[in-house]
Amino acid sequence: MTKTRLLSQSFFITLSFACFPVPGVVLQFRDGLNEEILKYTNKFRESKHLPALEMRDDLNEIARKHSEDMAKGRCSFGHSGYEQREAEVKKIITPFYGMAENVASGPTTGKEVVTLWKNSPGHRENMLGNYKYTGIGTAADAKGSVYYTEIFVQ
């Protein structure tokens, strides 16, 4: 077998394994989902004559980490570690006036997760609160269950 053919086959085998998810590995659910969630969140706020939220990459990263922690089982589903996330946000947003957080698991589209939150009194209150910024993060576990975190900051 020629050296070129051997290298070519090795590359193909390596590439083949790289295309399959490894059990336990968390993946971002899909591109554009954060923007879709933002769109429906702001559409809901607009329907109540509230200003649109501004999505920030630094807040997205904080939200993504929490979704990933839930997907990997490093924390239970919910608001574990909220105080630490709030402390991180306080370092980024100054002056800091307040923060709220919504989490969810199950829906597969931005519209579905926002509808779920709209129909829950506490989540709805967060979405309609006096906030200026948002951070959104998603992660899927090895079984494909999607975890969502949206934080709201003033």
Label every model-predicted segment.
Residues 2-11:
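Bacterial N-terminal signal peptides that target proteins for export
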Residues 19-154:
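Functional surface patches built around histidine and acidic residues
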Residues 10-18:
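Bacterial N-terminal signal peptides
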